[in-house]
């Protein structure tokens, strides 16, 4: 299993989630977050915004669905401009459903 954390523009979340659903990636957690990338925020004239609002999508997928989920996020979240976001992937050793106690997804 793989955990995918995608930090995307807030305005792209609906499109990204709809595209993921079409690809069969339905289960996810969505959080509103603030952060900055290499550009250290946005600088417009004399005004600086050090942290920008983003949306973080968190999902755990089976190994065979990882590449499809990443491709879907990249294609649906990309504008080609700075601030499109990042995707982080980490292995998940175990997962359990709290209600049933059963392991796995």
Swiss-Prot record:
The keyword Transcription applies. One of its GO terms (cellular component) is cytosol. GO terms for biological process: nitrogen fixation; regulation of nitrogen utilization. SUPFAM superfamilies: GlnB-like. GO terms for molecular function: ATP binding; enzyme regulator activity. InterPro entries: N-reg_PII, N-reg_PII-like_a/b, N-reg_PII/ATP_PRibTrfase_C, N-reg_PII_CS. Keywords: Nitrogen fixation, Transcription, Transcription regulation. It comes from the Archaea. Belongs to the P(II) protein family. Could be involved in the regulation of nitrogen fixation. This is Nitrogen fixation nifHD1 region GlnB-like protein 1.
